[in-house]
Protein backbone atom coordinates (compact mmCIF):
# COMPACT_ATOMS: atom_id res chain seq x y z
CA UNK A 1 0.00 0.00 0.00
CA UNK A 2 1.21 3.52 -0.80
CA UNK A 3 2.02 5.96 2.00
CA UNK A 4 -0.45 8.80 2.49
CA UNK A 5 0.24 11.90 0.42
CA UNK A 6 0.99 15.21 2.13
CA UNK A 7 -1.71 17.84 2.12
CA UNK A 8 -1.40 19.85 -1.09
CA UNK A 9 -4.32 22.14 -0.33
CA UNK A 10 -4.13 25.71 -1.55
CA UNK A 11 -3.99 28.58 0.90
CA UNK A 12 -6.90 31.02 0.97
CA UNK A 13 -4.76 33.54 -0.92
CA UNK A 14 -3.90 30.95 -3.58
CA UNK A 15 -7.57 30.02 -3.94
CA UNK A 16 -8.41 33.71 -4.43
CA UNK A 17 -5.66 34.07 -7.07
CA UNK A 18 -6.90 30.93 -8.83
CA UNK A 19 -10.40 32.38 -9.01
CA UNK A 20 -9.00 35.61 -10.53
CA UNK A 21 -7.14 33.59 -13.18
CA UNK A 22 -10.27 31.58 -13.89
CA UNK A 23 -12.16 34.80 -14.63
CA UNK A 24 -9.35 36.22 -16.78
CA UNK A 25 -9.10 33.21 -19.09
CA UNK A 26 -12.72 33.55 -20.14
CA UNK A 27 -11.75 36.50 -22.35
CA UNK A 28 -8.70 34.87 -23.99
CA UNK A 29 -8.83 33.23 -27.42
CA UNK A 30 -8.32 29.48 -27.68
CA UNK A 31 -5.07 30.00 -29.60
CA UNK A 32 -3.68 32.24 -26.87
CA UNK A 33 -4.81 29.76 -24.21
CA UNK A 34 -2.96 26.97 -26.02
CA UNK A 35 0.21 29.10 -26.12
CA UNK A 36 -0.15 29.92 -22.41
CA UNK A 37 -0.71 26.27 -21.55
CA UNK A 38 2.44 25.21 -23.38
CA UNK A 39 4.40 27.92 -21.56
CA UNK A 40 3.07 26.75 -18.19
CA UNK A 41 4.10 23.16 -18.97
CA UNK A 42 7.56 24.36 -20.08
CA UNK A 43 8.00 26.34 -16.86
CA UNK A 44 6.86 23.36 -14.78
CA UNK A 45 9.48 21.19 -16.48
CA UNK A 46 12.17 23.82 -15.86
CA UNK A 47 11.08 24.02 -12.21
CA UNK A 48 11.42 20.24 -11.90
CA UNK A 49 14.94 20.42 -13.40
CA UNK A 50 15.95 23.11 -10.89
CA UNK A 51 14.53 21.06 -8.02
CA UNK A 52 16.32 17.89 -9.18
CA UNK A 53 19.58 19.85 -9.50
CA UNK A 54 19.22 21.18 -5.97
CA UNK A 55 18.63 17.66 -4.66
CA UNK A 56 21.73 16.37 -6.48
CA UNK A 57 23.84 19.18 -5.03
CA UNK A 58 22.62 18.37 -1.53
CA UNK A 59 23.46 14.67 -1.85
Swiss-Prot record:
Transmembrane residue ranges: none
Disulfide bonds: none
SUPFAM superfamilies: NblA-like
Induction: Present at very low levels in nutrient-replete cells, and at 50-fold higher levels in nitrogen- or sulfur-deprived cells and to a variable extent (<10-fold) during phosphorus deprivation.
Family annotation (Gene3D superfamilies): Phycobilisome degradation protein NblA
NCBIfam families for the chain: PhycobilmeDegNblA
UniProt record similarity statement: To chloroplast ycf18.
Function field: Involved in phycobilisome (PBS) degradation during nutrient deprivation. May mark the PBS for degradation by covalent association with PBS components or may disrupt the PBS via ionic interactions.
Protein name: Phycobilisome degradation protein NblA
Lineage start: Bacteria, Bacillati, Cyanobacteriota, Cyanophyceae, Synechococcales
Gene: nblA
Amino acid sequence: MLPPLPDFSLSVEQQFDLQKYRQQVRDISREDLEDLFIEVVRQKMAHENIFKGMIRQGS
